């Protein structure tokens, strides 16, 4: 019998970035009738997260409005200029002792599905690993490749490191420190790793393609993160 611990996992959707590469606010872009922020919240909700928060900037207010429409708790990042780690800190600071882990799903991964999130949450609860990470596995001319994906699940044991003001390199640095002890879930579905942060990538997913599926990676194995 497999014993699964009920680790309280809170989904966190960072939506406070400047969207410079896209040229417009990614959170409010639509795909199949739902905004990117709605798709992220839906995936986390269907995937078994206990609660969900969306972190938005002070302006533009259109992002806040879209986030409020999802039914998730909406938090404000007063200064997102230092990158995604600032949104992560806002979320962790708000959650206090109410979360055992966070499932970090950036708003520009709109193809992630609830069943994908559930696989990751189940793995995190089963292993109690400090990190639970998804990778997309694929093959080009018989050579195996990996591409990083989301959501990444960070346990409470790592919160102090993520909150450390001296941290350089953001959450990526924390991932590298603890990668050997991470639980890795391998997916064959490219949607787990489809980052839609440029106009061409948005056009690709609207046409039903993943933005990178026809482009060989620069290295034979691209490892998380």
Stretches found by the model and what they are:
Residues 19, 29, 159-160, 203:
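Nucleotide phosphate-binding site architecture
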Residues 2-7, 160, 166-225:
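Conserved alpha/beta core of the MobA/IspD/sugar-nucleotide pyrophosphorylase nucleotidyltransferase superfamily
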Residues 2-148, 180-187, 212:
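Nucleotide and nucleotide-moiety/phosphate-recognizing core
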Residues 89-91, 157-162:
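Short beta-strand and adjoining strand-loop segment in the mid-core
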Residues 23, 64, 163-164, 206:
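A short local structural element in Rossmann-fold oxidoreductases
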Residues 31-34, 165, 169:
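Residues at alpha-helix boundaries and the short loops/turns that link adjacent helices
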Residues 150-154, 194-196:
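Short glycine- and hydrophobic/aromatic-rich loop-to-beta-strand nucleating segment
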């Amino acid at each position: 019998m497999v014993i699964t611990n009920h680790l309280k996992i809170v989904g966190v959707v960072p939506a406070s970035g400047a969207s410079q590469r896209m040229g417009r606010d990614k959170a409010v872009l639509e795909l199949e009738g739902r905004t990117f922020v709605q798709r992220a919240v839906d995936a986390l909700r269907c995937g078994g997260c206990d609660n969900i928060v969306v972190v938005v900037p002070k302006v533009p207010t259109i992002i806040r409005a879209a986030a409020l429409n999802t039914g998730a708790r909406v938090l404000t990042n007063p200064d997102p200029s230092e990158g995604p780690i600032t949104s992560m800190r806002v979320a962790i600071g708000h959650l206090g002792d109410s979360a055992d882990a966070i499932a970090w799903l950036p708003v520009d991964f709109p193809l992630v599905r609830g069943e994908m999130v559930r696989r990751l949450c189940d793995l995190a609860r089963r292993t109690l690993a400090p990190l639970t990470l998804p990778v997309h596995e694929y093959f080009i001319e018989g050579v195996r490749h990996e591409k990083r994906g989301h959501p990444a699940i960070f346990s409470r044991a790592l919160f102090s490191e993520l909150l450390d003001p001296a941290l350089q390199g953001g959450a990526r640095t924390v991932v590298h420190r603890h990668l050997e002890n991470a639980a890795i879930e391998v997916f064959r579905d490219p949607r787990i790793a489809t980052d839609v942060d440029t106009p061409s990538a948005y056009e690709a997913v609207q046409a039903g393609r993943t933005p990178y599926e026809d482009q060989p990676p620069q290295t034979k194995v691209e490892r998380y993160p």
